[in-house]
Amino acid sequence: MLYSLKIKLFLFILILSSCSSKNDFRSIGGVEFAESSSEPFLYSSGDDLIISWTENKYDTNYLYTAEYLKDSWDNKELITDGQDWFVNWADFPSISYNKVSNVKLSHHLQKSSKSTFSYDINYHFFKEGRWFDKNKLHNDETKTEHGFVSSFPYKDGFVATWLDGRNTNYDKKEMDGHASGPMNLRSAFISSKGDVYENHLVDEMVCDCCQTSVTVSNGIPIVVYRDRSRDEKRDISISRYIEGNWTKPVSIHDDNWIINGCPVNGPNIDSNGDKVVVSWFSASNGVPKVSLKFSRDNGMTFGNKIMIDDIINLPTGRVDTEFISDDEVVVSWLSSFEGKGSLFLRKININGNQGEIKKIDDISMERSTGFPQIEKFQDDLIIAYTDSGSEEKRIKTFKMSISSL
């Protein structure tokens, strides 16, 4: 027993020694995030970095954005505001920027009835120097769930994917907590004028409330998401948009995670030229782990699964992934140790070599912490998350030099 405790203590010290110090991370100033701020979302076009977030005051929701200029947040701007929004820790507004046509896309979820599981995806479009409130991203009128949106620049507009509940019976879910029909994965394209076109069904049965993630690799849109089988296997699948159609979804890796309910823990994808990386969380056989795979051919095939070794800490997921060079990525995830949470990141190259585990911060494991964001901008890695462990819940943002990873 004593020997086991000594080993555990040694490994914990080893982890701590490999974690970076607070000096590696510098807080980002400029725009002050209000006490009620939460749900940050980062997007970088390479030349520009923007953030979106929400605030709530007196039953009114506000969706804001700001730019990263000269090492600080600047030009805070209101995208839209309103009441009866659906905003939660896992399904929150996003933002994207197409530098080819100088347009931006954002969204929020608007309640469509008094039913708990009834809301639409309302999107907002920025062009010619101002934001326009548009209509729904989807083309149905059902009073059901629509959410978990991801978007990415495509040609001179955007590609967007989301979870769509039009084929579910949510009156039944209101009564007994279970929907009678499957959740769909659907997509659409948005033109440089802000118009929606080409709605597609990507997968007719997917996990109900895990994030989708989309990228474009050499002009090919690629979406990853948590799939769902009839026997409740919920592994990660991928589909590519080729010649006007989405390919038949295939599994990224056969984790064979059987779980009778959504784990609310979606995958993440990023691309750099023909290289693609996908990271995800799984707890098959009761063993929680964060893994990733690389592709060298625009997501057509993937190499071996790479485990993000964590030795002591218990990974809980909420992953994000970002290319920082031609063949290197950074992965972030949440872990817990003896009930206390931390946000970690690690550099991995395409050959599977891993750098040190970097501890970003102690972080609450509550749902209100949300899904931390990382984004490369110039020579730095930008980090954003909701600090819900203090008396005042608000967004924190940091930067660290990529050379220190």
Task: State where each predicted segment sits.
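Bacterial N-terminal signal peptides that target proteins for export
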Residues: 1-9
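Hydrophobic h-region of N-terminal signal peptides that target proteins for export
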Residues: 12-20
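Extracellular, repeat-based ectodomains that mediate carbohydrate processing or recognition
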Residues: 20-405
